[in-house]
Structure formats: C-alpha cells, structure tokens
C-alpha cells in the first residue's frame, strides 16, 4: 500500500485539480470549459500534455477537444520531467566558447547554463524537495520544502493571526510564534531548523516557517478555522513594485513556481506576505492577470482570524542566492534560456499582446527616454533626426510614464519593436518581451556592464552597448548624494555618426535573424 503522505505529496506536486477533470469527463460542456481555462500559448500545449497524461487521455476520447493536433507530440517535454528523453526538450542553450572558470567543454558549458538559468533549474528544485512534516492519516497536514526553504508546499495549513504583530517592517522575523502556524502531522523539527543558513527576507521562507508546529488537532476537520480557503493559494514576498527589474524577479519566480507545481491555473489566490501595516505600490499590476483571476490579497486581510488553507505554496523568492534573476551567477559565453523565452510567451499570451507587423519591411526602432533627473540623452533630437533620415527605419520615441502610458500599452510597443534603445535603467527590463529577432541596445551602461547584458542572454536576444568611450560625452562626473562622483547620476550626449553605425549594425542583425518575418523578401538593408 502506498503511504498516505506519498499520496498527499503527489497531490500537492500535481496542483492541477484532478477532481475537476474527472467530473468533467461525463459532461461535455464542462470538459470544453476546462480546456478553455488552460489558456496556454499554442506552442506550450504539448509540453503541458506530456506532464498531464490524464488530460491527454480525455482529449483523445473527446471529439470536441481543441488540442487534437498536439496529441502527436506527447514526447515534447520542458526538460525537467523524469519522463523527458534527450532531444525532446523545449530548447537547449547555445554556448559560443568555453568559460574555463565553470566548464571544460562546450557541452559542459551548456549543461551549466541549463542548470543555472533554464529548465534544469526547475529540475534541481524538484529533486531537492523533502518532506518536513508527514501526515499519518486522512485529513492530516503536510509540509514539503526545497533546500533552505526557498520553496514550500503545504496541505491543511493552519495560520493563527489573532494576535498580529504588525509594524513598519515588511518582513518581521518574529511575526509568528509557536502554535500560530502549522498542521497536524509528524514534524521533523531538527530537519526544519537545519534549513536556516540562507535566512533573509527575500531569499528564504525560514523566518516564516521556523515556528511551524505539529498540532494536536486537524485544522479543517476539527473546526479550528474562522476562514477556510479551498482554492490553491500562493504566498509571495514581493520586491519593489515600482521598479520593473526588481518586480519582474517576482513574476519570473512565480512562473518557475508554477512549473515546480505543474499547474498554470489562474483559479488561484495569491497572498502578498508582508508584516507591514502599509499597502504595496505596484506599477505593473496588470501582469497579475497572467497568473490569477482575482485581486492580490494582502496578508493583513486575515488579521484577527484563524485561517486554514487546504492547499498552499510558498513561492520561489526574488532575491534568492543562486536564484533568478537578481542573484544569478551566470556562466559567460552562453545564451538562450528556454525558461525565460517560455515566460515571455506565457505572459504575452495571457495579456493578449500580439505581434503587429508593418506592411513594409522596415526596422521598427523604439527609443526609451527617461523623465528622471539623470541618464537623459542630451542630444536626443539630433539622434532621432539622423535615424529618420534612413528610409528603412521606422522610429518611435517613448517615455514609459505609468500615469501617461499603461503597462499593457507599454508591452504592446515593446513587443512590436525590432530594435529597443535606452539608457541603463529598469525600463530595459522590457527586453524580456521583445520578439526573438530583436536587438536591445543599452545606449550607455554607466559602467554597470553585466546587468542587462545577462538579462538579454537569459531572454536569448542580441545585446549591444556603446563601444567607443571617446565618443560619449557626460554632462559632468555625476553627483550621487552619498557616494559622490558616479556615472549613473549624470546625463549624456553621443556622437551621431557612431550612434548610426551601431544602429545600422543592430539592423543587420535583425534582418539576418532566421525568425525575422521579412527575411526571405529582403536581401539587404
């Protein structure tokens, strides 16, 4: 007989509502509704069906299943599944040369990159998951976590917030005490407490789960809950919601968490875990629509109550050690993470952002300008006029002010750009949503050389930056309020001819890319 805890673990890992599928099998309309709720990019369907063979079996029997054409490709896999065979994975990174600090061969380099920043990262998180609190009978709870509590899954979770210790801190370490979080299960307390080496607010769930307790009652069945949450719930600790680079570390890790749990349902609750009394400023809130059908819940909404969650996930965090993508130590000379490309496709699909090609084979250039005090382009008009004189260029200048241009409108512009130009800054995170053939041109990196170069490598698009230091002209040496002279705290002018040379090179890279839609009808710029 299979142990109960193993069955429950299987249920938590496969977060995909098997009961809904079973009940739908006898109801044609319900079955169709389920298919519609999946709402994945068409290219992702066979990968999903590979890991969800029960859905594939239903589809095979159902004459109205819209996924029939994908049933021929069930060998297709993301790469982290145990059933995934070589050659059938979603993609594999490209390495141009060996980084001998990490590997000895090109093949080893590819494997390193795949594990650092691709679906191999998901595979490692799955492999290191261990059960810390085992259920003994039906109705019991369970807690299973990856190494250092970077990600956890729980069933029948009890959370007692009748005595909330809220203040100004976002992540108060002693917010929960013994008995205020836990479940009825056999807890290996020593194993739990051994996972605290990486304790830090945005790197681990240790502070929140170190007081997880083995309870004497079944939280849900024994009526110890003021509120019972039936829907799967994802707890998230969020980075800065006003900075696209930092906030998209949240969204990327939420997407990775969905892969770890084999569930892409939007019929979930997302709870923002914070111990602060304050709200959360979010300039990119439209993005949540790609992950949930509901508004984000602040943890304080449950204050003064005992809340029980039947299924809960503590999501991967935005600043984890060796995580993605804020603290990623990335091997050099490799690029093209299938995980990041899939994330881009997933978000664009669910937010209904589409590619709208021009009638003529022109290179669409978007220049992102800044309305902040520093890192402005002093001779912007001169550069724009020079580009507009080129008959093959279509130029747009944008300022992504959230009060003027909504985030979905911003994404529409970005995704329909072939060359995206901007000064160093969080706005360049938009490169995640450029088409595959695009080039991102960080006009000047302000001596922060790796940030957007590495992000472009993850996304798998070409990156360029200013090359000749003698042809860029800072307004002054920069004046950081505390650090003194600093290249990020001034403005710049650029040599026009050198600028044109670089943009023309970027345009050649676009036109020669195998996926550029006009490649076959255009021989040269």
From Swiss-Prot:
Motif Required for optimal activity per record, residues: 293-295
Glycan-linked positions: 352
Motif (Prevents secretion from ER): 522-525
Gene Ontology MF terms: protein O-acetylglucosaminyltransferase activity
Signal peptide: 1-18
Catalytic activity: L-seryl-[protein] + UDP-N-acetyl-alpha-D-glucosamine = 3-O-(N-acetyl-beta-D-glucosaminyl)-L-seryl-[protein] + UDP + H(+); L-threonyl-[protein] + UDP-N-acetyl-alpha-D-glucosamine = 3-O-(N-acetyl-beta-D-glucosaminyl)-L-threonyl-[protein] + UDP + H(+)
Keywords (A to Z) from UniProt: Endoplasmic reticulum, Glycoprotein, Glycosyltransferase, Signal, Transferase
GO biological process: protein O-linked glycosylation
UniProt subcellular location: Endoplasmic reticulum lumen
Domain of life: Eukaryota
Role according to the record: Catalyzes the transfer of a single N-acetylglucosamine from UDP-GlcNAc to a serine or threonine residue in extracellular proteins resulting in their modification with a beta-linked N-acetylglucosamine (O-GlcNAc). Specifically glycosylates the Thr residue located between the fifth and sixth conserved cysteines of folded EGF-like domains.
Name recorded for this polypeptide: EGF domain-specific O-linked N-acetylglucosamine transferase
Organism: Xenopus tropicalis
Upper lineage: Eukaryota, Metazoa, Chordata, Craniata, Vertebrata
């Amino acid at each position: 007989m299979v142990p109960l805890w193993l069955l429950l673990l299987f249920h938590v890992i496969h977060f995909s509502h098997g009961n809904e599928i079973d009940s739908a099998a006898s109801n044609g309309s319900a079955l169709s509704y389920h298919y519609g709720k999946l709402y994945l990019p068409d290219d992702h369907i066979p990968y999903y069906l590979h890991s969800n063979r029960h859905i594939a079996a239903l589809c095979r029997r159902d004459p109205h299943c819209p996924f029939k054409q994908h049933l021929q490709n069930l060998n297709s896999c993301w790469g982290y599944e145990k059933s995934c065979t070589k050659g059938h994975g979603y993609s594999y990174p490209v390495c141009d040369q060996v980084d001998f600090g990490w590997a000895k061969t090109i093949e080893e380099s590819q494997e390193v990159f795949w594990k650092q920043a691709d679906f191999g990262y998901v595979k490692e998180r799955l492999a290191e998951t261990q059960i810390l609190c085992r259920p003994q009978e039906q109705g019991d709870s369970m807690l299973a976590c990856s190494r250092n509590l970077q990600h956890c899954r729980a069933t029948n979770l009890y959370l007692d917030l009748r005595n909330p210790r809220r203040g100004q801190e976002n992540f108060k370490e002693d917010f929960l005490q013994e008995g205020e979080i836990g479940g009825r299960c056999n807890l290996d307390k020593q194993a739990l407490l051994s996972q605290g080496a990486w304790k830090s607010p945005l790197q681990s769930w240790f502070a929140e789960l170190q007081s997880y307790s083995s309870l004497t009652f079944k939280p849900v069945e024994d009526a110890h809950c003021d509120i019972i949450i039936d829907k799967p719930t994802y707890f998230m600790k969020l980075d800065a919601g006003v900075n696209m680079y930092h906030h998209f570390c949240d969204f990327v890790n939420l997407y990775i968490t969905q892969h770890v749990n084999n569930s892409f349902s939007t019929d979930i609750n997302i709870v923002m875990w914070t111990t602060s009394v304050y709200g959360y400023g979010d300039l990119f809130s439209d993005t949540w629509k790609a992950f949930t059908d509901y508004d984000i819940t602040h943890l304080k909404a449950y204050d003064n109550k005992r809340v029980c969650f039947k299924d809960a996930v503590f999501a991967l965090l935005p600043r984890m050690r060796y995580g993605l993508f804020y603290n990623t130590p990335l091997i050099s000379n490799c690029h093209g993470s299938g995980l990041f490309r899939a994330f881009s496709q997933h978000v664009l699909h669910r937010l209904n952002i589409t590619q709208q090609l021009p009638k003529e084979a022109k290179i669409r250039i978007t220049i992102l300008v800044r309305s902040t005090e520093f890192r402005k382009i002093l001779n912007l008009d001169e550069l724009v006029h020079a580009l507009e004189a080129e008959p093959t260029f279509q130029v747009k200048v944008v300022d992504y002010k959230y009060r003027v241009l909504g985030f979905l409108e911003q994404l529409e512009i970005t995704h329909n750009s072939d060359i995206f130009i901007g000064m160093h800054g969080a706005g360049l995170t938009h490169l995640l949503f450029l088409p595959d053939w695009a080039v991102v041109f960080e006009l000047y990196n302000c001596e922060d050389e790796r940030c957007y170069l590495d992000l472009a490598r993850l996304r798998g698009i070409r990156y360029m930056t200013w090359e000749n230091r003698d042809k860029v002209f800072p307004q002054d040496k920069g004046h950081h309020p505390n650090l003194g002279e600093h290249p990020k705290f001034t403005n710049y002018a650029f040599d026009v001819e050198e600028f044109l040379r670089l943009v023309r090179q970027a345009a050649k890279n676009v036109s020669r890319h195998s996926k550029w839609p006009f490649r076959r009808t255009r021989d040269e710029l």
